[in-house]
């Protein structure tokens, strides 16, 4: 059962950096629905993309799986034999709850849940990889190496789904979308104190890139095609395709 997010409703004397700890994991479903515009749409559409791209006898990777929402969406839309989903997160609290969520929904496609660092995971025989609001928490200099590894591990015809919060080179547009995002959170019941305290904790941990930067990295990794397929305010998702015909 998900609890309502009230983590930052009272003043916190010493705000440290953001961590995905037990307290965050407990309220995460409520938090992300009220904080990330379009999140439910992205999750459901990841399932539709899985139906199109996942191939028989291949693997799907959900890197930074949190509580397993994307994994469950993918699994509901896999209709091939001998597929496997590998869901990875480095937060013990998230992994514990992810196991419960996955176990609560029975389906023929097996899910391997791994507590570990996505930078250390081998990507092999993949028809689809999901990075759903994960890359932004890696150090910027480490992001290209991960995308390179994903491209190498994807089979021809495979897809990467990359969802992120974006920054914007046009500061006027950036400010507008930033303010609209804050309006969205206010409309969902967050106070100015909650918004401010959470932002302070995230600012040194979540470092955002522009869509142009993401596309440049994807191109450098080898992806022949990439495009923004969803955006709401300063949040969105890209799909990157590896050319070729699935075996």
Swiss-Prot record:
EC number: 2.1.3.-
GO BP annotation list: tRNA wobble uridine modification
Catalytic activity: prephenate + S-adenosyl-L-methionine = carboxy-S-adenosyl-L-methionine + 3-phenylpyruvate + H2O
Enzyme class: transferase
Pfam families, per database record: Methyltransf_25
Superkingdom in the source lineage: Bacteria
Keyword Transferase attached: yes
InterPro entries listed in its UniProt record: CmoA (IPR005271), Methyltransf_25 (IPR041698), SAM-dependent_MTases_sf (IPR029063)
Coiled-coil blocks: none
Task performed by this protein: Catalyzes the conversion of S-adenosyl-L-methionine (SAM) to carboxy-S-adenosyl-L-methionine (Cx-SAM).
Protein name: Carboxy-S-adenosyl-L-methionine synthase
Gene: cmoA
């Amino acid at each position: 059962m998900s609890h309502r997010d009230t983590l930052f409703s009272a003043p916190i004397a010493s705000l440290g950096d953001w961590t995905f700890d037990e307290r965050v994991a407990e309220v995460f479903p409520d938090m992300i629905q009220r904080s990330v515009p379009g999140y439910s749409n992205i999750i459901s559409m990841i399932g539709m993309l899985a139906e199109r791209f996942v191939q028989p006898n291949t693997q799907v990777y959900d890197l930074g799986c949190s509580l397993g929402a994307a994994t469950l969406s993918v699994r509901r839309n896999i209709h091939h034999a001998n597929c496997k989903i590998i869901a990875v997160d480095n937060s013990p609290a998230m992994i514990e709850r992810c196991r419960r969520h996955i176990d609560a929904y029975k389906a023929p496609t097996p899910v391997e849940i791994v507590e570990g660092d996505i930078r250390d995971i081998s990507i092999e025989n993949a028809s689809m990889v999901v990075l759903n609001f994960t890359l932004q928490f890696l150090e910027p200099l480490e992001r290209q190496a991960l995308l390179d590894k994903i491209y190498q591990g994807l089979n021809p015809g495979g897809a990467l789904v990359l969802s992120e919060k974006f920054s914007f080179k046009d500061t006027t547009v950036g400010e507008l979308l930033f303010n609209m995002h804050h309006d969205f959170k206010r409309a969902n019941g967050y106070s100015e104190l909650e918004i401010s305290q959470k932002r302070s904790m995230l600012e040194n941990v979540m470092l955002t890139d522009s869509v142009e930067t993401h596309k440049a990295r994807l191109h450098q990794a080898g992806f022949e095609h990439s495009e923004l397929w969803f955006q709401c305010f300063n949040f969105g998702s890209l799909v990157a395709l590896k050319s070729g015909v699935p075996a």
